[in-house]
From Swiss-Prot:
Keywords: Coiled coil, Cytoplasm, Stress response. May act as a negative regulator of salt tolerance. This is Stress response protein NST1. It is found in: Cytoplasm. It comes from Meyerozyma guilliermondii (strain ATCC 6260 / CBS 566 / DSM 6381 / JCM 1539 / NBRC 10279 / NRRL Y-324) (Yeast). Residues 99-110 have a biased composition (Basic residues). The keyword Cell membrane does not apply. Signal peptide: none annotated. Disulfide bonds: none annotated. Belongs to the NST1 family.
Length: 1107
């Protein structure tokens, strides 16, 4: 047997090649086979099992999913669903496109089948199709046409088991209020989808009117499998058009009605409403509307619409009839009520056949009673009072019977089965009493008026095909056509979900949809009776008149009542589906949750087992680890002991080395301390001697100054007395001269030289007191003059204290300090006087010689502080300058031997003579050490030398003033010096120098020579200046990255300080000035070397004066 499942394809089964197992089963007791295979159901009582070979069964399991060796999918056969398990190689998962592949796969699987019931008839002509959702559908092809009017089964809810209904009720009660409201929420789209789904399922269950080939060629992807004939298509179009019109015009009224019906009970009563209770509610609502309408209208006869309910569906179905009276109707008024007889017969039959009936049977009885009552329409001859009375009694009967059924349902759902039977029996007696108390008169007119409805409906059903054929040629009303088209064209929304439900539910759902379509068809037949238009003589005008008369008979209220009832049915079904779907979803979630819990439990059990194994392994590892730890501890203990012994030995050796080092260090420090003490003692001794010498010099200087001051005062007094005497003597002469013409000023000044001399002498003295160079020149000139005159040097001069130029202020207050470049610039002296201008004795000796490059401000003159001419050092062995005093010799004796006074590389006065005259000596003085600027030589010689007896004492400032140099010639000059002078020199120098020479020192000297000289470094220079220069030098070294760990080398800092200060300072004086002073703004930290000498210095600013 060749089969193909997938892609909507189907094949005919004409020759079976397998054996089948066919057993007569019912849908309720049908069970799945114990072994995996294929289960197909065809019809109501035949069950086919396709079993696999035992060898092939090893590769599969009893329960499989799609994509594995087998796949299960729901199937539908003639309106019933089942389950098919398709082996691998068949169905949707098969890729077989040729018979060879299929045969190979069938050989591998070894599929065998056996027939348990050979007498069962096997359908040789059938079609197996695949639905769009993958379902397998088996259809028989024996009959060419399906029956349009198949037997209608009970609804989903009426055939539900007690357990399912109880579960649904419990599920509804467990829902929260928002969830309940969401389930009962009504919208237009949901109801419209229900109608379309109903139409699709109804057409899918009906057969077609053409050959079987057309059915097999229907598309598998279409949403339904309905008939495609022109009659069915037009009918569906009409129905859909009518529904669309109803939605557009009456949707709001319908929704209000549905809400009114739904709100009669609270949400907790919804299960009872869904399981049949809504019949009573709808009927009660309809009766109330009828009574209200009758009270508001007159006594004229009106057309009423009585509900017609099918025998298999719960909701009532509307049916309209004509109000034309017939003779049979008038005769039936006096006859017994057929509804009474029918109800009595139904009750009696029910009690006999169902002594222990279930609730479902009671619901069917209630529907039959309703159907019996709805099939009878009261006649037009009855009065308004009788109709109202009949309606009230009928309403009371239906209400009592509905309450009894609802109470029975509540008892059954709560588990009170015995109480249900008791209540049902009591309810039957109550209904019977109420029914018999009307004496057959309550419902006579109502039932007899409706007696003709059943026969009329039967006739309409028989002529349905003729009406459909006739409706193809006639113009149908737009509303009905649109309603049919809407149900036919729209795609179903629910069928795929319903097909996944159990087979009993799906079958009931399909039957319900068939019933609804039948009701719509009955409405169409009843509203439009085309039999009256079959007469060819019936023209269009008569048709229009009769149609208008019929429409006028049906009031708008009755139409709305029918529409409301129709929509009420759909809303109830919508509620049912929603509740069922929600319940299924909850069941699925619960199962999923339980499955997850089971999986978690299994996983936890596995984890616990693994954890136990891990614990055992951990224990074993821990035991091994403890053993290893013990071994490691023992090994570490031994190593620690070994290290402790080695450490103890090492400490002893270090102590010995430290002790030896300490002893050496103590010895070294002791030596250094002794050395420092000796140095300090020598320094203190020198300082004491220096202080004594300075004190002695100071006293001598003060004494000399006092004598000079007294002599000056005496001279000034004498000068003043002389002036006063001269004034007194000259006053008569002045008076006489005033009478005479005044003489020129030049003559006056020449005539009184004595008056101007004292003033000029005082001016010269004042100038000379400010110009050390002037004093030096006067001293030299006076000394030479005395030497030339052969005067003996004064011995007492050496004992007089000399005033050092170092005691002069660093900078005179009246003028700024001279620039060093200006000081070092050579000075060009004016031309010396000629020999004609000089005295006869001085010609050719001193005058007339050129003066070359004399500058007393050269660096050679002002050397270092230790070699300074202004210090207290001796002048032993020094010469006057780097140049010679003259070409001739002064005598056989020398001044100071061969040592140089101004430099170390200049000729001395030892071998020079004064024969060349005074001019040559002046030239030598003017050329003092200009070429040598190294500052290594000085007039004072090396430091520390004492003054010998024959050395020149320091030249005093006061001794250099005036026109003469008293006592300026030192006593150390040998006595034979004066005798060695040539005679012409002693005779050529006058006793007193000319006035211009006395006032301006030596002739040829520039007037600019009288400016104060820069001193190298006075003894009492400010220490703060040295500190400032030292700090600037430290910052320069720091900016040039010449520091060593933030410290500057002492020697390098000293050299940089000398450059910044532009003065010569000794290293000891530099260190002494930089020592910490609490009043200074700078702080200097010293670092000493191993011998106690300062090696490095760190300079910083003080944060405060008291830091």
């Amino acid at each position: 047997m060749d089969t193909t499942f997938g892609n909507g394809e189907c094949e005919m089964f004409t020759s079976p090649h397998q054996k089948f197992c066919a057993t007569q089963t019912s849908p309720s007791n049908m069970k799945e086979p114990d072994e995996p295979g294929v289960a197909l159901k065809n019809g109501q009582g035949v069950h086919f099992d396709y079993h696999m070979h035992p060898e092939a069964r090893k590769d599969s399991e009893s329960t499989v999913v799609a994509g594995e060796s087998h796949s299960e999918m729901p199937i539908s056969s003639n309106g019933h669903n089942g389950t098919i398990a398709v082996p691998e190689g068949y169905g949707a998962n098969s890729n077989g496109t040729s018979n060879k592949k299929k045969k190979k796969k069938s050989k591998k699987r070894h599929i065998d089948a056996t027939i348990n019931d050979p007498d069962a008839e096997y359908p040789t002509s059938r079609v197996i199709k695949q639905a769009p959702n993958g379902d397998v559908i088996v259809e028989s092809l024996e009959d060419e046409h399906h029956d349009h009017h198949s037997n209608l089964s009970a609804t989903i809810w009426d055939n539900s088991t007690i357990e399912e209904q109880e579960d649904l009720k419990r599920f509804w009660e467990s829902l929260e209020e928002p969830e309940k409201v969401k389930l009962v929420k009504i919208d237009k789209k949901s109801i419209l989808d229900l109608f379309r789904t109903f139409s699709s399922n109804q057409q899918g269950g009906q057969p077609t009117h053409h050959s079987p080939a057309s059915s097999s060629t229907s598309l598998a992807g279409t949403p339904h499998h309905g008939c495609t004939c022109s009659s069915c298509g037009r009918r569906s179009s009409i129905i859909e058009a009518e529904l669309e019109m109803i939605y557009d015009n009456h949707f709001d009224d319908i929704i209000d009605f549905i809400h009114e019906v739904r709100d009669i009970k609270d949400l907790n009563a919804l299960p009872g409403l869904l399981f049949g209770g809504f019949h009573m509610l709808e009927e009660e609502h309809r009766m109330k509307k009828t009574r209200a309408r009758r009270r508001s209208t007159d006594l004229q006869p009106q057309t009423r619409i009585s509900p017609i309910t099918s025998s298999t569906d719960g909701p009532p179905e509307p049916t309209t009839t004509s109000n034309v009276s017939t003779p049979s109707h008038s005769e039936s008024v006096s006859s017994p009520s057929p509804w009474t007889n029918a109800v009595a017969g139904l009750l009696e039959k029910f009690l006999q056949e169902n002594p222990g009936a279930s609730w479902n049977k009671c619901s069917q009885l209630f529907q039959e009673i309703q159907e019996a009552g709805n099939q009878v329409n009261p006649g037009n001859g009855s009065s308004e009072g009788s109709d109202r009375e009949n309606d009230d009694k009928k309403t009371a009967f239906l209400k009592d019977f509905g309450e009894m059924i609802s109470g029975g349902f509540n008892d059954m759902t709560s588990g009170k089965q015995e109480q249900f039977h008791e209540n049902f029996a009591n309810g039957i007696h109550k209904i019977a009493n109420d029914f018999l108390n009307n004496d057959g008169k309550s419902f006579v007119e109502m039932v007899e008026a409706l007696s003709g409805s059943r026969s009329e409906r039967a006739d309409l059903l028989k002529s349905l095909q003729e009406i459909e054929d006739h409706s193809n040629q006639q113009e149908q009303p737009g509303t009905v056509r649109e309603q049919i088209e809407e149900l036919h064209d729209e795609e179903p929304v629910i069928p795929e979900d319903i097909q996944n439900q159990p087979k009993e539910v799906v079958g009931q759902y399909v039957d319900q949809r068939i019933n609804q379509l039948s009701e719509l068809r009955d409405r169409l037949e009843e509203e439009y009776d085309y039999d009256t238009y079959d007469d060819p003589e019936y023209d269009n005008q008569e048709y229009d008149e009769e149609l208008s008369d019929t429409e006028s008979e049906i009031s708008e209220e009755e139409k709305m009542q029918e529409i409301r009832r129709l929509f009420l049915i759909q809303v109830i079904k919508l509620f049912q589906e929603r509740l069922k779907n929600a319940y299924k979803e909850k069941l699925s979630q619960d199962r999923t949750r339980r499955l997850i819990e089971e999986l978690e439990a299994e996983e936890n059990a596995k984890k616990e087992k693994e954890l136990k194994k891990l614990k055992q392994k951990e224990k074993a590892k821990e035991k091994k680890r403890l053993q290893q730890v013990a071994k490691d501890e023992e090994r570490r203990r031994k190593e620690e002991e070994e290290r402790a012994r080695e450490e103890e030995l090492r400490l002893k050796q270090e102590e010995l080395r430290a002790e030896q080092k300490r002893r050496k260090e103590e010895a070294r420090q002791k030596k250094e301390e002794e050395k420092r003490k000796r140095i300090e003692e020598l320094r203190l001794k020198k300082e004491a001697e220096k202080k004594k010498q300075e004190e002695k010099e100071r006293k001598e200087r003060e004494l000399k100054e006092k004598k000079e001051r007294e002599s000056k005062e005496k001279e000034e007094r004498e000068m003043m007395e002389k002036k006063e005497q001269l004034k007194k003597e000259q006053q008569p002469k002045v008076e006489q001269t005033q009478e005479k013409p005044q003489a020129p000023p030049s003559q006056t000044s020449q005539s009184n030289p004595s008056v101007s001399d004292p003033i000029s002498s005082r001016q010269d003295n004042s100038v000379s007191s400010l110009d050390p160079t002037h004093d030096l020149q006067n001293a030299i000139s006076s000394g030479l003059e005395q030497l030339s005159l052969g005067q003996q040097p004064m011995s007492h001069i050496s004992s007089q204290p000399s005033q050092s130029i170092s005691q002069l202020p660093i900078q005179p207050p009246s003028q700024p300090f001279l620039d060093m470049d200006q000081i070092r610039s050579p000075v060009t002296a004016p031309a010396m006087p000629t020999q004609a201008q000089m005295p006869q004795s001085a010609r050719g000796s001193l005058w007339g010689q050129p003066v070359n490059n004399f500058s007393p401000f050269s660096e050679g003159v002002w050397g270092s502080r230790n070699n300074s001419i202004w210090g207290n050092s001796s002048m032993s062995g020094g010469s006057i300058g780097s140049g010679t005093m003259g070409s001739g010799t002064i005598g056989s004796g020398t001044i100071g031997g061969s040592a140089s006074i101004w430099g170390s590389q200049t000729p001395t006065l030892a071998n020079t003579t004064m024969g060349m005259g005074l001019q040559s000596g002046i030239n030598g003085i003017q050329g003092l050490s200009l070429e040598k600027e190294n500052g290594s030589a000085s007039i004072a010689g090396t430091p520390g030398n004492s003054l010998p007896g024959n050395s020149l004492p320091p030249i005093s400032r006061n001794s250099l003033s005036g026109n003469s140099i008293p006592g300026s010639i030192p006593s150390s000059i040998p006595g034979n010096l004066s005798g060695s002078l040539p005679g012409n020199l002693s005779g050529s120098i006058p006793g007193s120098l000319p006035g211009n020479l006395a006032a301006n020192s030596l002739p040829g000297m520039s007037p600019s020579m009288s400016v104060p000289l820069p001193q190298p470094f006075p003894a009492n220079v400010d220490n703060e200046m040295i500190r400032t220069a030292a700090y600037q030098a430290f910052m320069l070294l720091q900016n040039s990255n010449q520091l060593e760990y933030g410290l500057a080398a002492a020697v390098k800092l000293y050299q940089t300080t000398i450059l910044v200060l532009s003065m010569e300072v000794s290293f000891s004086q530099f260190l002494g000035s930089c020592r910490d002073d609490i009043e200074s703004s700078y702080r200097f930290d010293y670092v000493y070397d191993d011998y106690g000498a300062v090696s490095h210095i760190k300079a910083s600013l003080r944060s405060s004066l008291w830091n």
